[in-house]
């Protein structure tokens, strides 16, 4: 089974490309570290398969929490990222959520309906 990591980014925020890249990196690193500790077998598979990562866009913060609720109910590692507010958004603004790494079939059940960023 294919293993991947997905990051869902809010599109209602006025973030530049560099800011989005940094937020996605925060989500990916946070999820990877958590998976390395909590889901070692899946993490190792993901590493061996080339660390597939997908970034999708969601309309707003409400959608982030809908994704989180579903991921939590399925036991999928997830990390909601809140910005510190030094540059483009207010402190504490939720910018994205990372999911996985986990099996693609499970992540697609949660994020498959969203368009790629």
Curated annotation (Swiss-Prot):
<comment type="similarity">
    <text>Belongs to the PTH2 family.</text>
</comment>
<dbReference type="InterPro" id="IPR023476">
    <property type="entry name" value="Pep_tRNA_hydro_II_dom_sf"/>
</dbReference>
<dbReference type="Pfam" id="PF01981">
    <property type="entry name" value="PTH2"/>
</dbReference>
<dbReference type="GO" id="GO:0004045">
    <property type="term" value="F:peptidyl-tRNA hydrolase activity"/>
</dbReference>
<dbReference type="GO" id="GO:0006412">
    <property type="term" value="P:translation"/>
</dbReference>
<dbReference type="InterPro" id="IPR034759">
    <property type="entry name" value="Pept_tRNA_hydro_arch"/>
</dbReference>
<dbReference type="GO" id="GO:0005829">
    <property type="term" value="C:cytosol"/>
</dbReference>
<protein>
    <recommendedName>
        <fullName>Peptidyl-tRNA hydrolase</fullName>
        <ecNumber>3.1.1.29</ecNumber>
    </recommendedName>
</protein>
<keyword id="KW-0378">Hydrolase</keyword>
<dbReference type="InterPro" id="IPR002833">
    <property type="entry name" value="PTH2"/>
</dbReference>
<keyword id="KW-0963">Cytoplasm</keyword>
<comment type="function">
    <text>The natural substrate for this enzyme may be peptidyl-tRNAs which drop off the ribosome during protein synthesis.</text>
</comment>
């Amino acid at each position: 089974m294919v293993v991947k990591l997905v990051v869902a980014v809010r599109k209602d925020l006025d973030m530049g490309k560099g800011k989005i890249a940094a937020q996605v990196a925060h989500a990916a690193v946070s999820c990877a570290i958590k998976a390395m500790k909590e889901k070692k077998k899946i993490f190792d598979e993901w590493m061996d398969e080339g660390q597939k990562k997908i970034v999708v866009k969601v309309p707003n913060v409400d959608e982030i929490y809908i994704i989180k609720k579903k991921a939590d109910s399925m036991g999928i590692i997830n990390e909601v990222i809140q910005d510190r507010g030094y540059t483009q958004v207010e402190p504490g603004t939720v910018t994205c959520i990372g999911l996985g790494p986990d099996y693609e079939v499970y992540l697609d059940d949660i994020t498959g309906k969203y368009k790629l960023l």
